[in-house]
Regions:
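Conserved alpha/beta enzyme-core scaffold
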Residues: 1-232
Length: 232
């Protein structure tokens, strides 16, 4: 069984160059590959296209890469919690492609399945449909959406083994799982790295065949996106 372990985030990110397209896992502020984002900032790679459900917040997640102006284009679904994202988008500094959330996840999965495109009714009759091919099937219109082509996918898992098998935890599974299948090279950072064979096969969410590099992450934060307390 192939050992896919690398020493750290810096080693895992080798080969990422200016102008590449990267899938970045996470949902809200959970399941974010924090170590890899920090390493990308130090690496200084720029003009990136990032595919992610959201853009983090101003001082966490992809918001950190927006602060350093390393992202050229965001392909996302929900971006409403990041003031710096809004500023860059409205000023024309940042290209933005907003995609329905289900379509975003499916375009990631289709890349992993090797399926080049798929039909969906989501977005028909809206700006999402502009410039896209449409078909009519049994009296209903569908958009033709293409699978993503990402140079790298970077995800964070709860547990992983040295062969690259991954288990995600609760909501953090949301986009990490489909993205872990969709990159030409997939990098996984994990909270707990175990020997191959330690994970129960029926609990594995992403088989190691999709994962190329894995490393033990450290110092993860447990951020709260919006703190709400009861009023007395």
């Amino acid at each position: 069984m192939i050992n896919k372990v690398v020493a750290n985030a810096e080693e895992a990110l080798k080969g990422i160059e200016d102008g590449m397209t990267i899938m970045m896992g996470g949902f809200g502020l959970c399941g974010i590959p924090e170590n890899s984002i920090s390493a990308l900032i130090k690496k200084g790679t720029k003009n990136l296209t990032c595919i992610s459900n959201n853009a983090g917040v101003d001082d966490f997640g992809l918001g950190l890469l927006l602060q350093t102006k390393q992202i050229k284009k965001m392909i996302s679904s929900y971006v409403g919690e990041n003031a710096e994202f809004e500023r860059q988008m409205l000023s024309g500094e940042l290209e933005v492609d907003l995609i329905p959330q289900g379509t975003l996840a499916t375009r990631c999965m289709m890349a992993g399945y090797g399926i080049p495109f798929f039909p969906t009714p989501a977005g028909v009759g809206t700006e999402v449909a502009n410039g896209k091919q449409m078909i009519n099937w049994k009296g209903r219109d569908y958009l033709i959406e293409e699978a993503f082509e990402a140079d790298f996918a970077i995800v964070k898992a709860w547990k992983g083994d040295t062969a690259g098998n991954l288990i995600f935890r609760s909501t953090a599974r949301n986009f990490n799982q489909p993205m872990s299948m969709g990159g030409k090279i997939t990098i996984a950072e994990v909270e707990e790295l175990l020997p191959a064979g330690s994970l129960q096969p029926d609990q594995i969410h992403t088989p190691g065949i999709y994962v190329h590099r894995i490393f033990q992450g450290h110092n993860y934060e447990k951020r709260i996106e919006q703190r709400t307390v009861r009023k007395k």
